[in-house]
Structure formats: C-alpha cells, structure tokens
Amino acid sequence: MLNALGVIVSGRLVQTDFQQISDSHFLITIPDADNVNHVVVFLTGTTPFPDGMAGGVYFSWPDPNAPPNWQLLGYISNTKPSAIFKISQLKKLDEIAGQSTMMNNVFGSNLPISHIAQIGVSIEPESSLVQQTPSTTTSSTYYQFGQKIVENFFNFVSSFSITQSQMTPAPNETFVPLSTVQTWYTNFERRLQQNPNFWKN
C-alpha cells in the first residue's frame, strides 16, 4: 500500500512518501503547514483497497508535550479514489500566535517558525468510515446559521450606538462599549470558522 497513496498540497510537488506504521496505518508529514488551507489525498492506482475497505484520512498537529490528537477528515475508497480536505479550520491559531516570539534574535533577526502537520491513512471497513465521516452540509449550515445570528445581533446593537457626548445620565441603565461587542463578534466568527460546532461544548 505504500506506493498506493499520495498527497497534494497546492503549489508543491506530489508527496507519496508515506511511512507504514502497521499493516493498516500509514503516515506522511506535511512540512511548513501553517499556510496550507486544503490537501488532496488520493489513490495512485497501483494497488486498490481490499473489497469492503477504505482509507480513513486523519489529520494531526504534532505537539511534543502531548500525545497526538487525530481528527477524522473523511475517507477515500476504490469508488472515491481522491478527496479534498480543508484543514485551515483545524489549525491551532492561538498556539501558533503564542509561539511566534520564541524565535527572536536568531542571527540578529526574527525568523518564522516552521510547523509540520501529519496526515494518517487507516485502512478500515468502508461502512464504518461512511458513518463516522462528518457531513460538510451540516457543518456548512451550522456555520451559515451561526454567522447570520451573530451579524443580526451585531447590527441590532450597533443601531443603538451613540457617542459618549450624546449620552444622558441613566442610573438604571448599563452601557457596554461597542468596541467590546466588536471584539466578541470577531472572536465568535473566528471560532465558528474553525469549528461550526464549538458552541455545543
């Protein structure tokens, strides 16, 4: 199966150098993954999956201080030999931002940190993978619904905004700066883009 799998990252050469971890698990490293938004995982056509089996495609950002956190992206099979997966919403943006100061003063300059990602393919029963694969339609619907609610709320609150000089004393009213609502809106939208189901937790 080693030569049967490939990965394409936009603007880069095709990668087929999967490492075999076990009889049914294969792993490949994606260097400089910070700016990668989508990956294509495909069968090269040299060896098909056994009947009834498919390749579950998993994604992980390796962390030296924690065990791997694998996330199922979807699957490929003999009848669906390639798939495009969006990984940008899976990135640990907060951790990347927090680590950006670690490379200061190397050779007298600030150098960007290079992060790697890993993609694993696990040979599993196709029926099981079909049931586990997240529905992009549902995720997209949640995202659109959440975004509309947030936009509606922000527009509603903004319609009542006044400057401090326009305010009249109202001891029974509580005022919230519009900038605070804007910050909340920005954070909520970012979290919604990363994971449309984050609000369920």
Curated annotation (Swiss-Prot):
Transmembrane segments: none annotated. GO terms for molecular function: Hsp70 protein binding; nuclear import signal receptor activity. InterPro entries: Hikeshi-like_C, Hikeshi-like_N, OPI10. GO terms for cellular component: cytosol; nucleus. Pfam families: Hikeshi-like_C (PF21057), Hikeshi-like_N (PF05603). It comes from the Eukaryota. GO terms for biological process: protein import into nucleus. Belongs to the OPI10 family. This is Protein OPI10 homolog.
